[in-house]
């Protein structure tokens, strides 16, 4: 099923603790029986996120590759994406029929974006626990990602966040670009994200 242009590469970014790894796990579980898939994770000094996915059984260990960026995490996905491009090339060597590569950035800030050379689609994850004001702060991840995921909606009552305000701000900042409100630990919203990837990414 692999495209002649190579696998679809989906970049998943967002601040530390927003739920990127939870989303990676949910997507791996949804896609692994239908597509040739692998996952690449970025951490500054460890391969912790890769370990989490492996322990969770999201994919076989050989389909998960941890990248240690050793510095500013957004540099490894934007200004100098060579370490991640090399990781994609390695996975394509291991699995020549790859359909889909999920690339999780290291915890980054609201200004971080993926290089178009690295990712065909970009998803950005923020979380309700970060505060009601997060969507209105803007930044490329919030305003220009192909899909914005507002995660941990279940925590809204605990942190005093008004989801209707967050949604209004999200709509204002993104215009017509799509977004999803989710609670990924419970699996809520993951199907919508998976469907978006299939449709927007042209997966057959």
Curated annotation (Swiss-Prot):
Q: Does the keyword Nucleotide-binding apply?
A: yes
What is its subcellular localisation? Cytoplasm
The Gene Ontology CC terms held by the record are:
cytoplasm
Q: Which keywords annotate this record?
A: Chaperone, Cytoplasm, GTP-binding, Nickel insertion, Nucleotide-binding
Question: Membrane spanning segments where?
Answer: none
User: CDD domains given for it?
Assistant: UreG
Q: Which residues bind GTP?
A: 14-21
Q: What Gene3D superfamilies does the entry give?
A: P-loop containing nucleotide triphosphate hydrolases
* GO MF terms, alphabetically ordered: GTP binding; GTPase activity; nickel cation binding
Q: What is its main location?
A: cytoplasm
The record's section on SUPFAM superfamilies has: P-loop containing nucleoside triphosphate hydrolases
GO terms for biological process? urea catabolic process
Classification via InterPro entries: CobW/HypB/UreG_nucleotide-bd (IPR003495), P-loop_NTPase (IPR027417), UreG (IPR004400)
Q: How does it assemble?
A: Homodimer. UreD, UreF and UreG form a complex that acts as a GTP-hydrolysis-dependent molecular chaperone, activating the urease apoprotein by helping to assemble the nickel containing metallocenter of UreC. The UreE protein probably delivers the nickel.
This chain's function reads: Facilitates the functional incorporation of the urease nickel metallocenter. This process requires GTP hydrolysis, probably effectuated by UreG.
Matching entries from HAMAP family are given as: UreG
Name the family the entry cites. Answer: Belongs to the SIMIBI class G3E GTPase family. UreG subfamily.
What is this protein identified as? Answer: Urease accessory protein UreG 1
Source organism of the structure: Methylorubrum extorquens (strain PA1) (Methylobacterium extorquens)
Upper classification of the organism: Bacteria, Pseudomonadati, Pseudomonadota, Alphaproteobacteria, Hyphomicrobiales
The gene it comes from is: ureG1
